[in-house]
């Protein structure tokens, strides 16, 4: 059987991604080792029954269950096996989603797959695994595909595109409501842009996608309105940061709280210069990084600094978009607009797509260029107050903490533009059709992806879990002084393996980062009663099943009928 070219590109993309992801998480793929992830569990029950019981409790109390929970909840494989795999798989889906989108826009396989690789390992996008922000990674498993589905649904109007558009947008909402809201607004604007570009509004398909969206996302929307907003109000009322607690009135307190973690303008240089102000503030990552020689450095910038404070910061991620990514994005903008505005005699780039396709390409590049600029300005937060006040005044805008989150959208837009830059290089008049040119551009993309992965690698600090798994214990990480080990109780715990030293704490020879093991208590919690959330969860599961079956039938049915007719 002849292998199609598109399948070869897919396999190539997968192979390169697997190699780079293996490099990023190198040293933690063993079941006995996991990366530091402060906001995610790295210690799990060994029994599958406990994983299933935990997932059932979650469903009965919140109604939440989506396809990726099979991986994230450890329902089929050991949760220790899935610890790094679930993050890597989400990054893979994000890269594949951008490649899917750009292929639909007519870009070549190299441009599409290259942009996907750059997105998958983009600094802020990928390095948040070190913080354990699993909800963000669950969103990217589905959310990026919504752009390609929006484009195809408007252009082609096929049933499966509308069903998947509603489903993917809903699935992405379950565990990271704030970032989901930002990207859903961007997706919605792009959907409207597609309608303008194609000069039509398919209202029937839109209604179908909306019905699927609300049916599947019902438990998530209920949780956001009932729990998340109330929780954020309690955070603000308690004045959880020093600067917010000292505010003059409630309005100022809310503004300070929401705009903490604004991106300092001077740190925008890190978009193209990696590690300009160090790497991370996480003491566990720094301590273990020094122990294993990863080269990670303390963060010395101002991100996370309280308002008007002379010092202080906190971040657990990179801001590096990539020099190659930014360069290709600028090339994409320049080539498209130069090609559109120059006379045929002066054109240096031949896209060879016809005037209508060229017009649509300009639409897309314009959209992502403007979106990148706006999202960057929004990420500045209180450092660009007149602009961010516009976001703050929108519905739910005063609930969206940490304006630096807008940098995720900036990264996405720049990677999409980078795809157009790759395409522009491939279509230079003196490179087009030459294998050497293809190899040169491909090498540039691979260098850019490796450069990003090399930076992400610094945030992977391995934690030894052998003793935890051998005894099926719970574990907490703590800091002990040298003299604490002279305590008879601590000495006895060290002797029987209940206290395991991991590294010197922040390089201090008198402080130690340790694991403290405690016996795992049997899970005797009764199952929560059936609730309204569980009924909404049943509706969500039914909607998901209908979408999956319908799409499978639409994809496989014609082929089966063709095979039977032979």
What do these predicted ranges mean?
Residues 17-95, 117-140, 249-321, 381-397, ...:
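Membrane-interface coil-to-helix junctions
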Residues 17-20, 92-105, 109-195, 205-223, ...:
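Membrane-embedded helix bundles of polyisoprenyl
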Residues 9-44, 212-226, 374-377, 447-452:
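Transmembrane signal-anchor helices characteristic of membrane glycosylation enzymes that use polyprenol
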Residues 42-44, 125-137, 306-319, 374-414, ...:
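Membrane-helix boundary/interfacial segments in multi-pass membrane proteins
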Residues 221-227, 231-235, 428, 432-566:
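Transmembrane helical bundles and short interhelical boundary loops of multi-pass, membrane-embedded
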Residues 96-100, 144-152, 187-195, 325-339, ...:
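Transmembrane alpha-helices and membrane-interface helical segments
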Residues 1-26, 205-212, 327-330, 334, ...:
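Start-transfer (signal-anchor) and selected internal transmembrane alpha helices
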Residues 183-214, 224, 235, 333-354, ...:
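Perimembrane helix-loop-helix junctions
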């Amino acid at each position: 059987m002849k292998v199609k070219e598109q399948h070869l590109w897919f396999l190539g993309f997968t192979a390169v991604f697997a190699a780079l992801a293996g490099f990023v998480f190198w040293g933690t793929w063993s079941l006995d080792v996991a990366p530091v992830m402060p906001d995610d569990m790295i210690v799990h029950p060994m029994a599958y029954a406990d994983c299933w019981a935990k997932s059932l409790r979650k469903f009965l109390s919140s109604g939440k269950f989506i396809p990726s929970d099979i991986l994230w909840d450890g329902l089929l494989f050991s949760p220790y096996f899935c610890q790094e795999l679930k993050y890597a798989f989400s990054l893979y889906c994000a890269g594949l989603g951008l490649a899917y989108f750009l292929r639909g826009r007519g870009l070549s396989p190299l441009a599409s797959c290259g942009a996907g690789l750059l997105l998958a390992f983009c600094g802020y996008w990928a390095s948040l695994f070190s913080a354990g922000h699993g909800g963000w990674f669950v969103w990217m498993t589905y959310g990026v595909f919504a752009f390609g589905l929006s484009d195809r649904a408007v252009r082609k109007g096929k049933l499966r595109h509308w069903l998947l558009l509603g489903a993917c947008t809903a699935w992405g909402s379950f565990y990271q409501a704030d970032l989901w809201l930002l990207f859903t607004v961007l997706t919605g604007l792009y959907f409207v842009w597609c309608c303008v570009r194609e000069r039509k509004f398919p209202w029937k398909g839109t209604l179908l996608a909306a019905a699927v969206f609300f049916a599947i996302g019902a438990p998530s929307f209920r949780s956001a309105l009932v729990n998340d907003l109330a929780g954020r109000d309690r955070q603000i009322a308690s004045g959880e940061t020093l600067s917010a607690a000292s505010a003059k009135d409630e309005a100022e307190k809310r503004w300070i709280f929401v705009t903490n973690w604004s991106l300092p303008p001077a740190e925008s240089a890190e978009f193209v210069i990696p590690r300009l102000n160090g790497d991370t503030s996480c003491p566990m990552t720094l301590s273990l990084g020094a122990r294993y020689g990863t080269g990670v450095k303390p963060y010395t910038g101002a991100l996370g600094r309280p308002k008007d404070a002379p010092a202080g910061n906190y971040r657990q991620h990179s801001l590096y978009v990539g020099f190659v990514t930014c360069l290709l994005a600028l090339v994409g903008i320049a080539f498209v607009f130069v090609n559109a505005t120059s006379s045929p005699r002066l054109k240096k780039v031949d896209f060879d797509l016809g005037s209508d396709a060229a017009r649509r390409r300009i639409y897309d590049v314009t959209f992502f260029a403007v979106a990148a600029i706006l999202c960057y300005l929004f990420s500045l937060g209180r450092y660009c107050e007149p602009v961010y006040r516009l976001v703050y005044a929108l519905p739910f805008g005063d609930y969206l903490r940490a304006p630096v989150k807008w940098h995720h959208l900036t990264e996405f837009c720049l990677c999409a533009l980078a795809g157009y830059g790759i395409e522009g290089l491939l279509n230079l008049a003196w490179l087009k059709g030459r294998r050497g040119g293809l190899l040169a551009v491909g090498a540039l993309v691979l260098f850019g992806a490796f450069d990003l992965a090399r930076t992400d690698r610094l945030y992977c600090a391995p934690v030894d879990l052998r003793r935890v798994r051998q005894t099926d214990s719970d574990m907490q990480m703590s800091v002990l002084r040298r003299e604490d080990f002279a305590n008879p109780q601590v000495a006895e715990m060290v002797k029987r393996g209940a206290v395991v030293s991991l590294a010197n704490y922040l390089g201090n020879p008198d402080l130690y980062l340790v694991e403290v093991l405690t016996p795992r208590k049997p899970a005797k919690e009764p199952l929560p009663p059936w609730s309204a959330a569980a009924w909404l969860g049943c509706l969500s599961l039914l909607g998901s099943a209908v979408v999956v079956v319908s799409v499978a039938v639409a994809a496989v049915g014609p082929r089966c009928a063709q095979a039977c007719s032979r």
